[in-house]
UniProtKB/Swiss-Prot annotation:
Any single GO CC term annotated in Swiss-Prot or TrEMBL for this entry: nucleus
Keywords, comma-separated and alphabetical: DNA-binding, Nucleus, Transcription, Transcription regulation
Any Gene Ontology biological process: regulation of secondary cell wall biogenesis
Provenance organism: Arabidopsis thaliana (Mouse-ear cress)
Summary of the function given for this chain in its UniProt record: Transcription factor involved in jasmonic acid (JA) gene regulation. With MYC2 and MYC3, controls additively subsets of JA-dependent responses. Can form complexes with all known glucosinolate-related MYBs to regulate glucosinolate biosynthesis. Binds to the G-box (5'-CACGTG-3') of promoters. Activates multiple TIFY/JAZ promoters.
Induction behaviour: By UV treatment. Not induced by jasmonic acid.
Protein name, entry field: Transcription factor MYC4
A Gene Ontology molecular function term of the record: protein dimerization activity
Chain intervals for the UniProt region annotation (Disordered): 114-133, 291-326, 340-359, 381-422
PROSITE patterns in UniProt: BHLH
Effect of loss of the gene: Minor effect on jasmonic acid response and no effect on glucosinolate biosynthesis. Myc2 and myc4 double mutant has an increased insensitivity to jasmonic acid. Myc2, myc3 and myc4 triple mutant has no jasmonate-related defense response, is devoid of glucosinolates and is extremely susceptible to generalist herbivores.
Gene: MYC4
Length: 589
């Protein structure tokens, strides 16, 4: 990672996602990271002259936690948040004005996308581009971990478009007045772009690239020390509440406002165990920090990218020579996995975590270190250490987070209470119009008379309904009485018919039965009317009598049936069998 010649390369976000594989590549294929973080033996030509006194710097002790709390505490689904920090920079080699205000990477927090937003994407990155992204992530992790290992495991997961866009953002800087953050900072205003058309039609190259990489909303809110940028893969309408929260969180002169009162609750030990949340002291030098590229505009109108700069590490308190001892450029700590501290691995269970976070775990963390003098770094580090040991950490009071009501589908959220009241009155008037349409007789056109007429009409409908119910009950009673009378008449006729038929059967039918052990001989002589043959067979079946022989003959109207049967489980006497056959064969149909 220490080539002989210094390579200075400008990297621009391409218009098409298909060309993004060249975003990090250089002519030298020896290392992917040459394009992102390079080095050289002679760095004096890359450093600008001594800048004027710097602008007021932000307190980065909890800058990333503020970004995290801003996203996690919002009702909307924001994908990432970036703080662009203002500083006096070097605008270009041909520009003698060294008092140019630059907006460079201060810190960032990547939350990730919702599952439904990922499913909506119809143009995923190609296999080659995805492999390129994973390779860059593995190189970065290998660089951060010092080649100890874990880079291959950390770069196996898929890198989404929004994650790649967030990662590339750390190589960019903006001159005041150019680009989306630069315009917002120059005008001290808020720029809110919502929808693909708004992003695609923007004059800012970064906004157009955000739309290509799947963003639907980009917001830049100017603060005293920089610009807070938020992006989302969903369409989010403008909200004054978010702007107020940004003003409260990033007002560093007043201590950041009520940051502790509603910030996203973090585990107290998380800051020590999670490298993604390490925040450097403003004037201190922490071990394990990695110097990252210096932001440079390079004469671009909108977006400029970093030149390759040497990597300097401060491990275990040791000092490192700086090519320019008078100036220590802004450094960045790039955390791609949890578990790296002082150049060593923390725990084997953290090796397999992805460099790019999912919604459930991890995040991308890029933390910058404020400019400091390299000659006094050891002294300031010891002072910062002593101040850190004497500082009493007071946990912020936990308060419930406000949850506002979201508008229903198809409705836009009102901007203020006046708009909300107007919408409520319009809705009420629409309902009065609907009520007036269904009430037949309206005495007057005012609302009070309309309500009175509606009440009278409802009472009239209730009385009609009760009358209809009573009439229905009366009719049902009459039907029940008639059905009962008809049933009685039918039963009397049937009984009479049965009696007549029974008397005739008793007179006409003759049954003769002879029992020999378990066998019986049966002879029945009767009229052939009403199917006596079928009845005889049915009777034998019901009495469980097995037929050995049967015969049937008809002479005129007389039917003679003979059968030889064998008794089954039950034994019948001659009289019992005769009575049973008489009842079953001679019963009424």
């Amino acid at each position: 990672m220490s080539p002989t010649n210094v390579q200075v390369t400008d990297y621009h976000l391409n218009q098409s996602k298909t060309d993004t594989t060249n975003l990090w590549s250089t002519d030298d294929d020896a290392s992917v990271m040459e394009a992102f973080i390079g080095g050289g033996s002679d760095h004096s030509s890359l450093f600008p002259p001594l800048p004027p006194p710097p602008l007021p710097q932000v307190n980065e002790d909890n800058l990333q936690q503020r970004l995290q709390a801003l996203i996690e505490g919002a009702n909307e689904n924001w994908t990432y948040a970036v703080f662009w920090q203002s500083s006096h920079g070097f605008a270009g080699e041909d520009n003698n004005n060294n008092n140019t205000v630059l907006l460079g990477w201060g810190d960032g927090y990547y939350k990730g996308e919702e599952e439904k937003s990922r499913k909506k994407k119809s143009n995923p990155a190609s296999a080659a581009e995805q492999e390129h992204r994973k390779r860059v992530i593995r190189e970065l992790n290998s660089l951060i971990s010092g080649g100890v290992g874990g880079g291959d495991e950390a770069g196996d997961e898929e890198v989404t478009d929004t994650e790649w866009f967030f990662l590339v953002s750390m190589t960019q800087s903006f001159v005041k007045g150019t680009g989306l953050p630069g315009q917002a900072f120059s005008n001290s205003d808020t720029i809110w772009l919502s929808g693909s058309n708004a992003l695609a039609g923007s004059s800012c190259e970064r906004a157009r690239q955000g739309q290509i990489y799947g963003l639907q909303t980009m917001v830049c809110v100017a603060t005293e020390n920089g610009v807070v940028e938020l992006g989302s893969s969903e369409i989010i309408h403008q909200s004054s509440d978010l702007v107020d929260k940004v003003d409260t969180f990033f007002n560093f002169n007043n201590g950041g406002g009520e940051f502790g009162s509603w910030a996203f609750n973090l585990n107290p030990d998380q800051g020590e165990n999670d490298p993604g949340l390490w925040i450097s002291e403003p004037n201190g030098v922490d071990s394990g920090l990695v110097a990252a590229p210096v932001m440079n505009n390079g004469g671009n109108d909108s977006t400029s990218n970093s030149d390759s700069q040497p990597i300097s590490k401060l491990c275990n308190g040791s000092s490192v020579e700086n090519p320019n001892p008078k100036v220590l450029k802004s450094c960045e700590m790039v955390n791609f996995k949890n578990g790296i501290e002082n150049g060593q691995e923390e725990d084997s269970s953290n090796k397999k975590r992805s460099p790019v976070s999912n919604n459930e775990e991890g995040m991308l963390s890029f933390t910058s270190v404020l400019p400091c003098d390299s000659n006094h770094s050891d002294l300031e580090a010891s002072v910062a250490k002593e101040a850190e040991s004497n500082r009493v950490v007071v946990e912020p009071e936990k308060k419930p987070r406000k949850r506002g009501r979201k508008p229903a589908n198809g409705r836009e959220e009102p901007l203020n209470h006046v708009e909300a009241e107007r919408q409520r009155r319009e809705k009420l008037n629409q309902r009065f119009y609907s009520l007036r349409a269904v009430v037949p007789n309206v005495s007057k056109m005012d609302k009070a008379s309309l309500l009175g007429d509606a009440i009278s009409y409802i009472s009239e409908l209730k009385s009609k309904l009760q009358k209809a119910e009573s009439d229905k009950e009366e009719l049902q009673k009459q039907i029940d009485v008639m059905n009962k009378e008809a049933g009685n008449a039918k039963s009397s006729v049937k009984d009479r018919k049965c009696l007549n038929q029974e008397s005739s059967v008793l007179i006409e039918m003759e049954v003769d039965v002879k029992i020999i052990g378990w066998d019986a001989m049966i002879r029945i002589q009767c009229s052939k009317r009403n199917h006596p043959g079928a009845k005889f067979m049915e009777a034998l079946k019901e009495l469980d009598l097995e037929v050995n022989h049967a015969s049937l003959s008809v002479v005129n109207d007389l039917m003679i049936q003979q059968a030889t049967v064998k008794m089954g489980n039950q034994f019948f006497t001659q009289d019992q069998l005769k009575v049973a056959l008489t009842e079953k064969v001679g019963e009424c149909p």
